[in-house]
Amino acid sequence: MDSYAIYPSLKDKVVFVTGGATGIGESIVTHFCRQGSKVAFVDINAPAGEKLRAGLAAEVGNAPEFLRCSVIDTDALQATIRDVQERLGVIRVLVNNAANDDRHSIESVTAQYWDERMAVNLRHQFFAAQAVIPGMQQAGGGSIINFGSLSWKVGMGGMPAYVTAKAAIGGLTRGLARDVGKFNIRVNTVVPGWVMTDRQIRLWLDAEGERTMDRMQSLAGRIVPDDLARMVLFLAADDSRMCSAQEFVVDAGWA
C-alpha cells in the first residue's frame, strides 16, 4: 500500500470501469479496490481481466467483479450495467476509460473503420452514462469520469479518427454536466499525456519518443498509470464535490 490519499467517501461505493483489465484501467480498478469500493469492470481481454480479479482478491481481499463485454456492443454494455446494479447496487461512479489508439493513415480509413473508431473511443461513453444516470439521480448523485486525450490538443498526426473522437469527449462532458448537474451528478474529463503503459512501451516508445518527452514535458520523469488513477479517485470522491464540466489534465506540463 502506498502513502497517497485515502478517501473515506469511496468505501463501499459501487464503481463501474470500462477497459479495466490492463494499462490505465487496471490501475484504476486496483486503486478503487484498495479504497474499499465495490468495483465491477469490463474488458474484451478475458485472461487479463481474470488475472487482475484474482490478484486483487489475494492482495486486498476485495475482489472486483470482471465481466467480459465489448463496449462497441451498446446493448450488451447497457445490459451489463443493469446486471451490475441489480447485484451490487446503484453505480455511483462511472469511469469511461476504454479506448483504442491504433495508428492509421488518412488514406487507409474506410467508412466502416471510422464508425468503429467512434464506437470504441466515443460512443460507449455516452451510452454508459445514459445507463447509470437514472440510478445516480435516484440515489442523490454520482460522478461520471470520461477519458479524453492530449493527442488532439497538441495536433498529433497519424490517427485522425482517434483524435476526432477524443476531441468530441470534451463537448460530451460539458453537455452532460449541464443536463445532470441538477441531480448532483458531476461529469468531468481526465486528459492523459503520454502514459507509460505496457502497450505504449511495446508498440511506440523509442529513443525519439524519449527525446520528445524530455523536450515537451515541463516535468522530468514519466507519467505512469497510477498518476491517472489518483486523479480519478479524487474526481470520484466527495472531495471534488463542486468540480464538474471540467478537464483535468495529467500530462506533466506538455500542453
Task: Describe every region a protein language model picked out.
Residues 134, 178-182, 241:
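Alpha-helical segment proximal to the catalytic Tyr-Lys
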Residues 126-129, 222-250:
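C-terminal substrate-recognition "lid" of short-chain dehydrogenase/reductases
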Residues 129, 165, 173:
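Active-site helix of classical SDR
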